[in-house]
Each structure stands twice: as structure tokens, then as C-alpha cells.
Amino acid sequence: MFFVDVLWKLVPLYLFGSETKSLSATESILQIVPEAMAATSSNVLCNASESDLCRDDSAAFLLKFVAIASILLAGAAGVTIPLIGRNRRFLQTDGNLFVTAKAFAAGVILATGFVHMLAGGTEALKNPCLPDFPWSKFPFPGFFAMIAALITLFVDFMGTQYYERKQEREASESVEPFGREQSPGIVVPMIGEGTNDGKVFGEEDSGGIHIVGIHAHAAHHRHSHPPGHDSCEGHSKIDIGHAHAHGHGHGHGHGHVHGGLDAVNGARHIVVSQVLELGIVSHSIIIGLSLGVSQSPCTIRPLIAALSFHQFFEGFALGGCISQAQFRNKSATIMACFFALTTPIGIGIGTAVASSFNSHSVGALVTEGILDSLSAGILVYMALVDLIAADFLSTKMRCNFRLQIVSYVMLFLGAGLMSSLAIWA
């Protein structure tokens, strides 16, 4: 085939001459032969399956079982620790230990998106086996990542709106029976003014209620604390999670409510956990397939260590979000199992199709490149917006200098360690 390519290019050259009219026969041959050799080798590479000096099908098959067990245990442990630890004092979601561990996990997810997924998508969509048009004419990896981030923003926004309205409807329905029994001079909790644990508006831990002369239109005059009041001194009061009502003796009082923040935060945590799981699952399937179709033990061994590390801390971040969302035990268990099983299932599917799979085919490269790029956009958005910004810009972080230092160190450490794994996997 190589000689046919050379003759195919030489015959028109001698019949019609070269473009420069100055190339000799020897120069023409020296120019065409390397081009034909490069084209031939490229075609062989793109049409062939994996060819590696380290290829060993039987050893690779055994290593895939080790990978399934290791990654399954790592993912299950990572996602389970926050769910079990929410009933333990040292691992509660509002504790400093959890915040610093979550910062490390956020760094791992951020590095996964930038260094691993986006780089993998770029490598696949810039592969020489793909046709020049359109893949070499436009930066598709960054474009797909941007589209995924914008779609995630839209889903994040719409999901938050949906759950907030749902909680408002439930709150209004729960207080409606009480509204018929109250006198006109007493205000009942309006939408967004409920408190945690089913407490009535103004109820203290002792069980007493101190609603004093609050008119029905007080809901229209609710006060949010000015910036000066949102200080570290009042932070402990907000963390208590109880609402406080302050009445004025002249019967025209105004209520100060912090309970509405809990409903908003609850909706945010629900959406964050669901969108984060969607992003993690989408790239976990690709990772599992990539490992499953490989027949090289030299490739699989470092992937086992890298993916186990990656799955553990990704699972920890996801488990923390699920814990903060306060899902029911059944829903939390389903989400945790879905995360833990995704990559092993991908490895199993990849192993089943490994004999007939060509990783250099156009379809495989385009699919891998697009999904990797989309996953990168989702992970980068979730890491920066819903994990890092949500914690690092919070009052809890701002009011604790030591927590700031430790969290930043853990964030950079997680990102650095996950990035360094790109050397081997």
C-alpha cells in the first residue's frame, strides 16, 4: 500500500511537472516518500486497536477486577463517611473538620475538571485520526466546557427556584389552619418565616412564646440586618437556627426572622447535591470505560491508584452535600450507591467490549472528547461556585482566621495532589 501511495503521487508529477518547476526527480521523491510514510503510519494507527509493548490480556483482565474492587470500596467509603458522620460531633457538616476536608475534596474536583477531563477532551478532539474539518478549525473542547458550565448554571438556578417555591407552598399550607384561629392583631409566620424543627414563630428552647402586638402587615416591614450587623458577633446567633421576634409596646412591631435562610439554604443544598452527582456520574462512566477497554497492565496499574484516590474524595464532597441537603435515608442511600457503582459498571462495560473496541476510531474519539469536555465544564462550575465559593465566602469562614488558613492549604493541597496524578494517569 505504501508503494501505491508513492506511485500515485509521482505519476502526475512527472506527467504535468511540479508546482515550482524546479524540483528534480530525486528531490521530488525525497519530498513525497516521507509524506506517504506519515500518511500510511497514521492510517495504520487509526484503523488498528491498541498496540502496546506492555500489552497482556490475561494480566489486564485480572487487574480490572482489582480496579473494580478498589474503586468501589474507595467510592463507597468516601460517600458514606459524611452520611454516617452527620450524627457524630466531630464530623457534623457545620464543624471545622468537615469544612477543611470538604475544601480538600473541592480542590480534587477542580483539578479533575481542569487537568484531567479538559485535557483528555482536548487530546481526543485534537487527535490526528479525526478529519481536519471541523475538529482542527475550532477550539471545541473549551467551547463544550463553556456550554456545560452555562447549562449547569441554568439548571442550578431553575432547580433552586423550584425547591424554594415548593418549600414556600408547604410552609403556607402548614400555617393555614392556625391563621383562622388567630386574632387580627397577631401575625402568623408568613412564607419563608418558619423555623426549624417545627417550632412556632418566636418559640424559644424553653417552650415559651413571646409574640407581642405584631400586626398582620408586619410581614411587609420585615427587617434584614444591615451590613454592619452581619458581623462575627451575631454569627453565633444565626447559627443557632431559631427565629427571634421582637415586639414594640405600641402594638406596631416588626419581626426579625432568620428562619427563612434555612429554607433557602435547604433548597440550595438539594440542588447542589443533585447537580454535583450528575457531573460526577457523567465523567465516571467515561473513566470506567477507558480503563475497561485498556489491555495494558502498564496503563491500568497507575489508573487504579489514581482513580481510587479520586473517587474517595469526590465521594466525600458528594456525601457532604447529600448530608447538608438532609435527604431521607432511602434517597441518600440511593444517591450514594449510584455514585459508588458508576465507575465499576463502566469498567465492566469496557471489559466486555474491549476485544472489538478501537479507541482510535472517529466515533470513539469524538464521543470521548465531547463527554470529557462537558464533564470538565460541570465539575469546574460545581467546584468553584457551589463548593469553594459557598464555603470560602461564608460568615463562618470570614470570622475564623485559623479556619481560613487551614482551608486554603487543604484546597491547594487537594488540587496539587490530584494534578500531580496526571503524570502517571
UniProtKB/Swiss-Prot annotation:
GO terms for molecular function: iron ion transmembrane transporter activity; zinc ion transmembrane transporter activity. Its main location: plastid. PANTHER family: FE(2+) TRANSPORT PROTEIN 3, CHLOROPLASTIC (PTHR11040:SF142), ZINC/IRON TRANSPORTER (PTHR11040). Residues 119-137, 291-301, 355-369 are lumenal. It comes from the Eukaryota. Residues 86-97, 159-269, 323-333, 391-404 are cytoplasmic. GO terms for biological process: iron ion transport; response to nematode; zinc ion transport. It is a multi-pass membrane protein. This is Fe(2+) transport protein 3, chloroplastic. Keywords: Chloroplast, Ion transport, Iron, Iron transport, Membrane, Plastid, Thylakoid, Transit peptide, Transmembrane, Transmembrane helix, Transport. NCBIfam families: zip. One of its GO terms (cellular component) is plant-type vacuole. The keyword Transmembrane helix applies. May play a role in the transport of iron in the plastids. The lineage of its organism: Eukaryota, Viridiplantae, Streptophyta, Embryophyta, Tracheophyta. Belongs to the ZIP transporter (TC 2.A.5) family. InterPro entries: ZIP, Zn/Fe_permease_fun/pln. The keyword Ligase does not apply. It holds the Pfam family Zip.
